[in-house]
């Protein structure tokens, strides 16, 4: 256990989940929360018209100098809830290596760094991103320029603390643990414990979707007399999310997939699968049918994953085929719908997946395919949600119109996948195998 293990106690509770704002009270502004003008102007430029509930409740507490635990549903705007107070404290007393933000995944870390740079643009904030899959030397050079803020994944940060000459966090003033439950799910616990022993006394913000026993232990080890703010409840989905399921034969899943995509042509959608193989197969099949689909999964190189996300964000591709590597933490605006092509194994993952749409007050739709083999799993998910989800029943004749074209595209995808496997089997090294997977999107640049 770290030297900070005695820092806290039971957190003070603020803003219970059942609390609702008075109907006679106008929405607060960032200025009313105590945010300074230059940061308010940055919020306006980014389209932050009014604080979200997590921002409204967390920012004043953070500005008072308290340690903070924020529990909020995905898409709630929590990044700005910790970045704004952190930047305001930096402006009050500027210094190098002022703040450290830890995130569980490279993609989430990159998004947080982008938010820090955007909100801090008017005050010339220097932010450095430390993640795996990128060159250590380039990152060490960036650290040598003494940034104000570091956004990192735990493993890469520890690499630099142990190996980059002259780098330390002795003067650190703020620590943020974002997606803390995910950090612990990914077995970063031992690394976090080691990092906490290296860090000085500081203000700490911990944000999480859930408050598990592991997160409770991390809170006790890292926070001092914290205030807990909760704007979510267990197994909650966004209020403007419309959910439905399709009970279909397993062998017809691709037919129903193409039917739904055709019905929603031009909209932004994320299709979740259970395996890397299925992600690759669907990407190839759908592109052969004229759908602008791109894959993202854990076996892609970091540069390829970021390239896929950037194309999707830029709307040059409107279908993202994803494993659960993309189900959590990714801030992708304006996703119109989510489709669970393969059901997740538990309700927690279901909530994280469908939380990619209906974000920050917007509406969205979540479809789920339920086959004859998944009825029990679906009933468990419904039970955890605490409600029955409406069934969506397309006319079978309208679906089967696509059968011949889909069958042809399935054959092309199978041949392409076989060719890729043959290349793997001919002794190509890991780098080349990964590059081959990256080439799934090479045909449309």
UniProtKB/Swiss-Prot annotation:
Domain Helicase ATP-binding: start-end pairs: 59-229
Motif (DEAD box): 178-181
Stretch list, region Disordered: 1-28, 415-445
Domain called Helicase C-terminal: residue spans: 240-400
Pfam families assigned: DEAD, Helicase_C
Subcellular compartments: Nucleus
SMART domains xrefs: DEXDc, HELICc
Enzyme Commission code(s) on record: 3.6.4.13
Residues annotated for ATP binding in this entry: 72-79
Molecular function GO labels: ATP binding; ATP hydrolysis activity; RNA binding; RNA helicase activity
Biased segments, Basic and acidic residues type: 1-10
GO CC terms of this entry: cytosol; nucleus
InterPro entries: DDX47/Rrp3_DEADc, DEAD/DEAH_box_helicase_dom, DEAD_box_RNA_helicase, Helicase_ATP-bd, Helicase_C-like, P-loop_NTPase, RNA-helicase_DEAD-box_CS, RNA_helicase_DEAD_Q_motif
Catalytic activity: ATP + H2O = ADP + phosphate + H(+)
Signal peptide limits: none
Low complexity bias locations: 17-28
Intervals of motif Q motif: 28-56
Keyword Magnesium found: no
Keywords (A to Z) from UniProt: ATP-binding, Helicase, Hydrolase, Nucleotide-binding, Nucleus, Ribosome biogenesis, RNA-binding, rRNA processing
Broad class of enzyme this protein falls into: hydrolase
Gene Ontology biological process: rRNA processing
Functional note: ATP-dependent rRNA helicase required for pre-ribosomal RNA processing. Involved in the maturation of the 35S-pre-rRNA and to its cleavage to mature 18S rRNA.
Family affiliation: Belongs to the DEAD box helicase family. DDX47/RRP3 subfamily.
Subunit architecture: Interacts with the SSU processome.
Domain notes: The Q motif is unique to and characteristic of the DEAD box family of RNA helicases and controls ATP binding and hydrolysis.
Protein name, per record: ATP-dependent rRNA helicase rrp3
């Amino acid at each position: 256990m770290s030297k900070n293990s005695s820092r806290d106690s039971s957190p003070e509770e603020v803003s219970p989940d059942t609390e609702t704002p008075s109907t006679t009270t106008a929405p607060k502004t960032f200025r009313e929360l105590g945010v300074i003008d230059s940061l308010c102007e940055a919020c306006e430029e980014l389209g932050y018209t009014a604080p979200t509930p997590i921002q409204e409740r967390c920012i004043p507490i953070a500005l008072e100098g308290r340690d903070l635990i924020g529990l909020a549903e995905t898409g709630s705007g929590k990044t700005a809830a910790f970045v704004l107070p952190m930047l305001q404290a930096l402006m009050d007393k500027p210094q190098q290596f002022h703040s450290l933000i830890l995130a569980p995944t490279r993609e989430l870390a990159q998004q947080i760094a982008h938010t820090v740079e955007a909100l801090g643009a008017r005050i010339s904030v220097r932010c450095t991103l430390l993640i795996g899959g990128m060159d250590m030397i380039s990152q060490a050079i960036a650290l040598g320029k003494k940034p104000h803020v570091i956004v990192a994944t735990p493993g890469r940060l520890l690499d630099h603390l142990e190996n980059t000459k002259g780098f330390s966090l002795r003067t650190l003033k703020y620590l943020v643990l974002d997606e803390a439950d995910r950090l612990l799910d990914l077995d970063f616990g031992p690394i976090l414990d080691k990092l906490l022993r290296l860090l000085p006394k500081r203000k700490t913000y911990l944000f999480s979707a859930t408050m598990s026993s592991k997160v409770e232990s991390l809170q006790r080890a890292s926070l001092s007399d914290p205030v807990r703010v909760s704007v979510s409840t267990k197994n909650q989905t966004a209020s403007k999310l419309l959910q439905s399921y399709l009970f279909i034969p397993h062998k017809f899943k691709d037919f129903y997939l193409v039917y739904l995509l055709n019905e929603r042509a031009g909209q932004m959608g994320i299709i979740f699968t259970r395996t890397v193989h299925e992600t690759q197969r669907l990407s190839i099949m759908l592109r052969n049918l004229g759908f602008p689909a791109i894959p993202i999964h854990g076996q892609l190189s970091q540069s390829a994953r970021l390239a896929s996300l950037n194309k999707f964000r830029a709307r040059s591709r409107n279908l993202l085929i994803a494993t659960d590597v993309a189900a959590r933490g990714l801030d992708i605006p304006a996703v119109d719908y989510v489709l669970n092509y393969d059901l997740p194994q538990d309700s927690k993952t279901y909530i994280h997946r469908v939380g990619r749409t209906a974000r920050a007050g917007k509406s969205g739709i979540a479809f789920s395919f339920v086959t004859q083999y998944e009825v029990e799993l679906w009933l468990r998910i419904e039970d955890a949600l605490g409600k029955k989800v409406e069934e969506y029943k397309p006319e079978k004749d309208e679906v089967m119109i696509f059968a011949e074209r889909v069958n042809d595209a399935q054959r092309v995808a199978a041949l392409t996948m076989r060719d890729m496997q043959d290349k793997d089997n001919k002794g190509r090294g890991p780098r080349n195998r990964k590059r081959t997977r990256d080439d799934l999107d090479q045909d449309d640049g």
